[in-house]
Regions:
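Adenine nucleotide-associated cytosolic modules
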Residues: 1-192
Length: 195
């Protein structure tokens, strides 16, 4: 069985405020100073700022990821508010990316948030994903999941995938460039009923 390793990111120094902020991480042997420095140096692309992307972005910000790209083309709707916890009532009608950026920076002003207020397509997927170390797929449809997977495979980027359906959830890390399968390896064909 192949061993999956961490993405290669250069450690960076932490300020005194960051040492205090991340002190609970720093005392964990699995993270420590080196791990926290790698988190700060990491560039993560979060595709989707909805029901799954919202908590993903919040936890990544709280954990201290240094740069987070947020991809979404939609605006906040009242029907989003009960599950898309990164948005508030005051955000209704605003772009999800802008709402997400403000909440992320309210939680952790040290995170550089890069907004991609677009729909991910076959024309822009490679350019969107290329600058990042790892992709977090918080999308809610199969065509976008396959597109994200294919771009990550081509660019040799780890793809952290998650999905939610009612009270069930799935999560996986796909890194075929490190010897594991990809999303398309597990689900080679999409049924017409799911498109």
């Amino acid at each position: 069985m192949a061993t999956i390793t961490q993405p290669k990111v250069e450690p960076t120094t932490l300020s005194n405020e960051e040492v205090l902020r991340y002190s609970r991480h720093l005392i964990m042997p699995e993270v420590g100073m080196e791990g926290q420095q790698k988190l700060k140096a990491a560039k993560v692309l979060c595709i989707g700022a909805g029901g799954l992307g919202s908590p993903l972005a919040l936890y990544l910000a709280a954990a201290g990821v240094g740069t987070m790209g947020v991809v979404d083309f939609d605006v906040v709707d009242y029907t989003n508010l009960q599950r898309q916890i990164i948005h508030t009532t005051e955000d209704v009608g605003r772009k999800k990316t802008q709402s997400a950026k403000e909440t992320i920076n309210a939680i952790n002003p040290n995170v550089e948030v890069v907004l991609h207020n677009v729909r991910i397509t076959s024309e822009n997927a490679l350019d969107l994903i290329r600058p990042y170390d790892i992709v977090v797929d918080g999308t809610d449809n199969f065509p976008t999941r396959y597109l994200t997977n294919d771009a990550c495979v081509l660019l040799k980027k780890p793809n952290v995938y998650g999905s939610i359906f009612r009270f069930e959830g799935q999560a996986s890390v796909f890194a075929p460039h490190l010897g594991g399968p990809c999303y398309r390896c597990l689900y080679p064909k999409i049924g017409r009923a799911h498109v």
